[in-house]
Amino acid sequence: MKEQLNQLSAYQPGLSPRALKEKYGIEGDLYKLASNENLYGPSPKVKEAISAHLDELYYYPETGSPTLKAAISKHLNVDQSRILFGAGLDEVILMISRAVLTPGDTIVTSEATFGQYYHNAIVESANVIQVPLKDGGFDLEGILKEVNEDTSLVWLCNPNNPTGTYFNHESLDSFLSQVPPHVPVIIDEAYFEFVTEEDYPDTLALQQKYDNAFLLRTFSKAYGLAGLRVGYVVASEHAIEKWNIIRPPFNVTRISEYAAVAALEDQQYLKEVTHKNSVERERFYQLPQSEYFLPSQTNFIFVKTKRVNELYEALLNVGCITRPFPTGVRITIGFKEQNDKMLEVLSNFKYE
């Protein structure tokens, strides 16, 4: 076994609603608001597509997901040779890390961000430099100070998970202009579709200026396909060619591909869902206590508090399962009825 595995632990999902009911003696419904899933679910066209292809389950998928690749290529106006799919972004991150990193290499990222950047670097015996957050978001200037000619990968998450904060187009453009051109910069935009701020980066446009800027997106969040696992990277043709060597032959299932194509085609449904999310998100920031809420461009809100366990349990007592962190609680934005319950708790909670 690799010795570095002793530094890590397997991913631990939160307790199920049933287990939480037993642990806390809760009666009534519990709502899972801990994993940033799209509670509205996928487009109805997704269910139609799945039903239409159920008789194909005994076939292996078409390797490389060519139908979905063509759809993404048209949607983003990028060449198909620049797209690679994974079974969720978890697998994409794993493939990139495995293809790029060798023992002793170094990655640079943020201290409080998606944990798989760190996890996969350690698996490959690489070193990890984690720069502290600044005002709850990525400190791009601080990260630049740690990047040099020998850096192997830079991971940025925009908007950031778990804080929900973002950096703008000008900041990313300036950052990329100062990174050595041979150092890959991976920009994880898993929550891109929820963004409403106009100065959010046009990363696809920046890729025309910077060959080392690579973009990650997923169908797990706004498109509502977390259970089917489809994510992808848009990168240079050369990078995709090499990373494709790492990709398992049939990693995205046949049903997942059909579902993702159907979801992508129904942009009207996506707009409706993301609009509902932005309306409900704004309700949280109307509270007088919103000074404790980091500004979010996602479908979740990070609530800062020194009394993490107390807030987690207070929300649990009104039927809402959230995600505790050392410095606060991450809340997935739910339906109006669920949000009403959480807003009542948040408006009466003592944060200090």
Swiss-Prot record:
Pathway: Amino-acid biosynthesis; L-histidine biosynthesis; L-histidine from 5-phospho-alpha-D-ribose 1-diphosphate: step 7/9. Gene3D superfamilies: Aspartate Aminotransferase, domain 1, Type I PLP-dependent aspartate aminotransferase-like (Major domain). Pfam families: Aminotran_1_2. InterPro entries: Aminotrans_II_pyridoxalP_BS, Aminotransferase_I/II_large, HisP_aminotrans, HistidinolP_aminotransfase, PyrdxlP-dep_Trfase, PyrdxlP-dep_Trfase_major, PyrdxlP-dep_Trfase_small. Keywords: Amino-acid biosynthesis, Aminotransferase, Histidine biosynthesis, Pyridoxal phosphate, Transferase. It comes from the Bacteria. It catalyses: L-histidinol phosphate + 2-oxoglutarate = 3-(imidazol-4-yl)-2-oxopropyl phosphate + L-glutamate. The modification N6-(pyridoxal phosphate)lysine is found at residue 221. GO terms for biological process: L-histidine biosynthetic process. CDD domains: AAT_like. Its cofactor is pyridoxal 5'-phosphate. GO terms for molecular function: histidinol-phosphate transaminase activity; pyridoxal phosphate binding. Its EC number is 2.6.1.9. Belongs to the class-II pyridoxal-phosphate-dependent aminotransferase family. Histidinol-phosphate aminotransferase subfamily. PANTHER family: HISTIDINOL-PHOSPHATE AMINOTRANSFERASE, HISTIDINOL-PHOSPHATE AMINOTRANSFERASE 2. Homodimer. This is Histidinol-phosphate aminotransferase. It comes from Staphylococcus aureus (strain MSSA476). The lineage of its organism: Bacteria, Bacillati, Bacillota, Bacilli, Bacillales.
